């Protein structure tokens, strides 16, 4: 839901006011939100939306923004935002009811299965026990099982038409199904872009840049799509066009100052310059920087065969925002991809030897 509120706050609200109106909005935001004036003054529209949500929470930020637009007598924006918010809340209520009904049905099925299992033979029982003890028996796997159940609730059967912007080559990694080849892609609709984790390398011939495809039976997480072997991906003939501003946002490397205010779990792709490297036995800590600040990137395992040096750049794919104590950092996961881009060596004048 947070992504929906962020989208409506930006696209339905802040993007529809002029620079002068934005200054007035920021003036009233000082009293509505606990944000420093210095932070508000330099924030662009996207950063402002992030600051508002970080300060008040997603739903509350939209409500407060509506109040400000009403004070400024920008009623067309206030009304549009209010309608979008009600629509999102209705959708949430509908999904909650559906999930509640599904849970009751699942509980009933589980009780029936439990009663039926009492009549199973010893051999059947042993076979089932052997299956259940397998990797999930480890304590650290319990959370993974819970996450799998949560993922199933977000199965999207309705097709989504998107245009492929980018796809990397398949690589091997550990997944819940074991070691397999996967790849990552970026796709877009006419209003937004999404990162996609594709758990079946056979779909690679569908994810060709500029091609329009239809995806169904996929999993939707809070900030990315997951395409599995059960998903359906087909080519479609469509006049589907992605606006330049959406393409630009999809290709941009997020600024470090913006990453530091993102919630944990946010997926990050981008190219960053390295200024410090700390190597340990099973991990490497990279210090990255840009014009807006510095940050650390924690890469677990052996990230790359190419040795990284200060001044090189690292391309991160499917990394996550995480916390190390109070410090915000980027962290690799089981399906992250890491690549070193060597810095160009300065050209030196060739001296002749006589």
UniProtKB/Swiss-Prot annotation:
GO biological process, one term: tumor necrosis factor-mediated signaling pathway
Residue span(s) of domain Pyrin: 1-87
PTM remark: Degraded via selective autophagy following interaction with TRIM11.
Tissue expression as described in the entry: Expressed in developing neurons. Highly expressed in regulatory T-cells (Treg).
GO molecular function terms noted in the UniProt entry: cysteine-type endopeptidase activator activity; double-stranded DNA binding; identical protein binding; pattern recognition receptor activity; signaling adaptor activity
Chief localization: cytoplasm
Top-level taxonomic group: Eukaryota
UniProt xrefs under PROSITE patterns: DAPIN (PS50824), HIN_200 (PS50834)
Keywords: Cytoplasm, DNA damage, DNA-binding, Immunity, Inflammasome, Inflammatory response, Innate immunity, Nucleus, Tumor suppressor
Region of interest (Disordered), residue spans: 95-124
UniProt similarity note: Belongs to the HIN-200 family.
The protein's role, per its UniProt record: Sensor component of the AIM2 inflammasome, which mediates inflammasome activation in response to the presence of double-stranded DNA (dsDNA) in the cytosol, leading to subsequent pyroptosis. Inflammasomes are supramolecular complexes that assemble in the cytosol in response to pathogens and other damage-associated signals and play critical roles in innate immunity and inflammation. Acts as a recognition receptor (PRR): specifically recognizes and binds dsDNA in the cytosol, and mediates the formation of the inflammasome polymeric complex composed of AIM2, CASP1 and PYCARD/ASC. Also acts as a tumor suppressor independently of its role in inflammatory response. Able to suppress overt cell proliferation in enterocytes: restricts stem cell proliferation in the intestinal mucosa in an inflammasome-independent manner, contributing to a decrease in the likelihood of colorectal cancer development. AIM2 suppresses cell proliferation by inhibiting phosphorylation of AKT1 at 'Ser-473', preventing AKT1 activation and AKT-mTOR signaling pathway.
Name of the featured protein: Interferon-inducible protein AIM2
Gene this chain is encoded by: Aim2
């Amino acid at each position: 839901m947070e992504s929906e509120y962020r989208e409506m706050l930006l696209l339905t609200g802040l993007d529809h006011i002029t620079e002068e109106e934005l200054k007035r909005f920021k003036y009233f935001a000082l009293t509505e939100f606990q944000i420093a004036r210095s932070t508000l003054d330099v924030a662009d529209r996207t950063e402002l939306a992030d600051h508002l949500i970080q300060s008040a929470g997603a739903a509350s930020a939209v409500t407060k923004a509506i109040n400000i637009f009403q004070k400024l007598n920008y009623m067309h924006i206030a009304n549009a935002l209010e309608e979008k918010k009600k629509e999102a809340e209705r959708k949430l209520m509908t999904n909650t009811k559906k999930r509640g009904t599904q849970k009751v049905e699942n509980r009933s099925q589980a009780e029936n299965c439990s009663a039926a299992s009492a009549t199973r033979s010893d051999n059947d029982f042993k076979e089932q026990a052997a299956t259940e003890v397998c990797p999930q028996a480890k304590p650290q796997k319990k959370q993974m099982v819970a996450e799998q159940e949560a993922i199933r609730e977000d199965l999207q059967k309705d097709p989504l038409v998107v245009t492929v912007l980018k796809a990397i080559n398949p690589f091997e990694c550990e997944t819940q199904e074991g070691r397999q080849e996967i790849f990552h892609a970026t796709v877009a609709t006419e209003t937004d872009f999404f990162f996609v984790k594709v758990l079946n390398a056979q779909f690679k011939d569908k994810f060709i840049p500029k091609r329009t495809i239809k995806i169904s039976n996929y999993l939707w997480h809070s900030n990315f799509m997951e395409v599995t072997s059960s998903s359906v991906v087909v080519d479609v003939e469509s006049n589907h066009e992605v606006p330049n501003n959406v393409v630009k946002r999809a290709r941009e490397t997020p600024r470090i100052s913006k990453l530091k205010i993102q919630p944990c779990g946010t997926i990050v792709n981008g190219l960053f310059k390295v200024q410090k490297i700390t190597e340990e036995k099973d991990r490497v800590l990279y210090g990255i920087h840009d014009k807006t600040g510095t940050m650390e990137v924690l890469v677990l395992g052996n990230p790359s065969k190419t040795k990284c040096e200060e001044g090189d750049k690292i391309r991160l794919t499917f990394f996550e925002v995480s916390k190390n104590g109070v410090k915000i950092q980027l962290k690799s996961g089981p399906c992250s991809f890491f690549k070193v881009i060597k810095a160009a060596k300065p050209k030196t004048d060739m001296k002749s030897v006589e």
